């Protein structure tokens, strides 16, 4: 009897020591290796140069700029200069993106038209500020690439179109704000027409291969008034014919 009792005790002890089946650990979020560089960019290059709009600073702190440049330029993504993205186009330097975004005075829910999607970075910044963004790119390959990256990063409030941005995107007009990221030699008439009353339009204007002027146009009583925001250098706006 004592021996049988001892065997039962041993069996229970062994059962208690058996390893439990553990649930697999939850997947870990991908680590962003550029968090520090992005914070330094915002502090030194943007806030340090006078940009004060909290929504702009928050968006630039959040948007992963390195995801919008070719892989070989990822390490330079947060430096304050433009970078090539292919097809003769560039991603604007962070300070210019911030300056133009601040000038638009975008509010959550605003409908914003962007002419010149390029890499998609400017659209992502505006989307992170809460805007509903409609962006037009004339180069099919860039339009496709930008749409793919924006989709991967979850920017559901950005709508892309491969078309000639000189004529805007009339189907979704009027817009609270319009931003143009390439330089024509004049203000396209369609853009002024598609701007909502009280809206703001930021655009570089000037000759190809020379210094251009960044302008802020504000629409009041159907008229556009212009403010000079300073000298800039952008790739030319192509298209403009039907």
Give the residues covered by each predicted segment.
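Conserved alpha-helix/loop element of class I SAM-dependent methyltransferases that forms part
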Residues: 40-43, 48, 77-87, 91-109
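Short clusters of hydrophobic/aromatic residues that line enzyme substrate/ligand-binding pockets
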Residues: 68-69, 78, 83-85, 169, ...
């Amino acid at each position: 009897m004592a021996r049988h009792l001892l065997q039962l005790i041993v069996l229970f002890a062994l059962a208690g020591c058996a390893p439990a089946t553990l649930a697999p650990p939850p997947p870990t979020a991908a680590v962003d290796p550029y968090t520090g560089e992005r914070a330094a960019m915002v502090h030194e290059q943007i806030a340090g140069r006078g940009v004060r709009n909290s929504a702009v600073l928050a968006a630039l702190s959040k948007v992963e700029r390195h995801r919008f440049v070719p892989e070989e330029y990822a390490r330079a993504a947060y430096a304050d200069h433009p970078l090539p993205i292919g097809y003769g186009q560039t991603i604007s330097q962070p300070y210019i993106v911030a300056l133009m975004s601040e000038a638009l005075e975008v509010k959550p829910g605003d409908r914003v038209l962007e002419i010149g999607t390029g890499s998609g970075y400017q659209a992502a910044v505006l989307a992170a500020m809460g805007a509903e963004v409609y962006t037009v790119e004339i180069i099919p390959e860039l339009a496709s690439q930008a749409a793919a990256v924006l989709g991967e990063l979850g920017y559901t409030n950005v709508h892309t179109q491969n078309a000639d941005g000189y004529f805007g995107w009339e189907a979704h007009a009027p817009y609270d704000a319009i931003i143009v990221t390439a330089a024509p030699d004049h203000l396209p008439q369609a853009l002024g027409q598609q701007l909502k009353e009280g809206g703001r339009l930021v655009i570089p204007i000037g000759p190809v291969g020379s210094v251009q002027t960044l302008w802020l146009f504000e629409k009041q009583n159907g008229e556009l008034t212009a403010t000079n925001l300073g000298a800039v250098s952008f790739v030319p706006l192509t298209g403009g014919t039907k």
